[in-house]
A protein has these predicted regions:
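Rossmann-like AdoMet
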Residues: 1-71
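S-adenosylmethionine/decaboxylated-SAM
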Residues: 11, 31-49, 68-210
Length: 210
């Protein structure tokens, strides 16, 4: 059973009302292009939503992914915005991995997207700007563009990555993350993408970078 199959099974148990008989057009495209990752029949059981990445925001999905973290290493989020997701992730981490001494690191320019993005909603350069850097316990925020902050970060933090949440939407930003962490993403690293598939331009952004 693939990881996606397991997620789908948990979704079914978590909320039966999501089950319907039709497939959204964007999800048909996913089935056609990456059959090795997704079983076509699975999409008959999913309720149409604006985009798949909304499902990943459900608490149950965060919990499922963190349950599968086995490495002792860095916990990272790329694309913090107002801090809602990293707050949830950190609370689950503390519950499921109480012995972990690692803090969460959040990366964001806090100046909005560096370029236009056509995702679940069309956003322009500068959109998704946060008024201020969030403040929360056991979390360190790194303000700036990924191409500047990640190289400096990896000079100081050389541990392998245990968990990486990529919520930066754009191909260019995702490439910055994956290239700079290439030596620290190892077998066993859990990577959660927020916008991997499920919207019209999915195959030219996070998916393409991965």
């Amino acid at each position: 059973m693939t990881l996606y199959d397991k997620l789908l099974k948990q979704q079914k148990e978590f909320d039966q009302k999501w089950l319907v008989s039709n497939i959204p057009r964007s999800q048909k495209k996913v089935c056609e292009k990456i059959p090795d990752l997704f079983e076509k029949k699975a999409f008959y059981k999913m309720k149409p939503r604006p985009c798949n990445h909304e499902l990943a925001r459900e608490y149950a999905y965060y919990e499922y992914c963190i349950k599968h973290v086995e490495l002792d290493g860095l916990w990272l989020e790329f694309g913090v915005y107002n801090g809602a997701s990293i707050k949830y992730l950190n609370s689950i981490k503390k519950k499921l991995k109480p012995d972990s001494k690692q803090v969460f690191h959040g990366f964001d320019s806090f100046e909005g997207l560096p370029e236009d993005w056509k995702g679940s909603v069309r956003t322009k350069k500068g959109d998704l700007k946060s008024i201020e850097v969030p403040s929360m316990p056991d979390t360190i925020f790194h303000k700036g563009w990924f191409k500047d902050t990640i190289p400096e970060f990896v000079k100081e933090y050389k541990d392998q990555c245990a968990f990486v949440h990529i919520d930066c939407d754009l191909y260019s930003s995702t490439v910055d993350v994956l290239e700079n962490l290439s030596s620290q993403i190892v077998p066993g690293t859990v990577i959660l993408f927020d916008e991997l598939t499920g919207y019209d331009a999915w195959d030219i952004h996070e998916y393409k970078a991965f």
